[in-house]
């Protein structure tokens, strides 16, 4: 399906959500929670069943029913299902992705109390899917994060299944040697849905109330960069904020990609930091590092060797440094550009 359809619901009627019984996973745990954030499903009854009679009596089915129509049925297990979030994505959707695709904008607006503009809503809609929901889709559909050749002998250095959200949700199912009645599974599912839903709401609020407002600060710093240094390679933020993704996006918008190399900002103690700009938002490789001879030095030794008073540290890897004043971190950045 190419278009995103929404079912028109009669809010005066009591709604019923249905998902499958038995063992549960992260995707339907989140899908059910997201639906219940919406006014039309806030007080909906939840039925966990594989009985077609229960499906027929329900208003919406997630992760069960063997079909997807974007109105009542939101399953992804059937043959021939290859739906993705949009044409930019290749990951096949799970029930979490399907519900978010159709209801995500309304879900975000509900979490943020409708305090979001149309353009910002579109940005958050993509951001939340990319940073959170897509990974659940991939996990449930058995899609690896990496494309690894079949003949590869790569082995992980450690196991992280138990600390991943899908792993935690899986562990919330009843143990095999405990009560495994439908009632027990339903109680455990309710706890799992609340757990992953809480993580999701915290994430959306963080993006809407912290990450998104930071864009204006980064944009202003970029616009004023020539007042900081004539090279245009250093920007100053009035305080720390999530800046990396905004920096890359704004560079593209302003056609100045890869030109900014250092970001100055205050930390929580009131001291100043100079950060290199990574080649991407998750990399420790940087466009330009702090001076090699100063890496790993601290305090007086660093101040003496650099000739810059008030230095605190430069990380041994050269990606960040600290000092007591804006002037000091500016000088460290300038030394790196020389």
Swiss-Prot record:
GO terms for cellular component: chromatin; cytoplasm; nucleus. One of its GO terms (biological process) is positive regulation of cellular respiration. It comes from the Eukaryota. PANTHER family: METAL DEPENDENT HYDROLASE - RELATED (PTHR11215), MYG1 EXONUCLEASE (PTHR11215:SF1). Present with 6080 molecules/cell in log phase SD medium. Belongs to the MYG1 family. This is MYG1 protein YER156C.
